Amino acid sequence: MFTMKKSLLVLFFLGTISLSLCQEERNADEEDGGEATEEEVKRSFLTTFKDLAIKAAKSAGQSVLSTLSCKLSNTC
């Protein structure tokens, strides 16, 4: 019973230390990443532009397909 308590204490201690180290690293990352760099701004702009272009292409493709299906089935 004593050895089981001892091993549980060791596991708890090691878990607490690793959790503490992760918290310190997270705090350091938050302090460093306060301002967006120029590359991050460009990347976010390009991602937004790409998403808008994809949505426009899907919309155009759907309208072309609906027009073609209408003309092929002579229901226009």
Curated annotation (Swiss-Prot):
Subcellular location: Secreted
Signal peptide (from-to): 1-22
Tissues with expression: Expressed by the skin glands.
Function: Has antimicrobial activity against Gram-negative bacterium E.coli ATCC 8739 (MIC=12.5 ug), against Gram positive bacteria S.aureus ATCC 6538 (MIC=6.3 ug) and B.subtilis ATCC 6633 (MIC=25 ug). Has no activity against methicillin-resistant S.aureus ATCC 43300 (MIC= ug) and fungus C.albicans ATCC 90028.
Propeptide, residue positions: 23-41
Family stated for the protein in its record: Belongs to the frog skin active peptide (FSAP) family. Brevinin subfamily.
Keyword Secreted attached: yes
GO biological process: defense response to Gram-negative bacterium; defense response to Gram-positive bacterium
Cited InterPro entries: Antimicrobial_frog_2, Frog_antimicrobial_propeptide
Protein's UniProt keywords contain Nucleotide-binding: no
Protein name as catalogued: Brevinin-2ISb
Keywords noted in UniProt: Amphibian defense peptide, Antibiotic, Antimicrobial, Cleavage on pair of basic residues, Disulfide bond, Secreted, Signal
Disulfide bond entries: 70-76
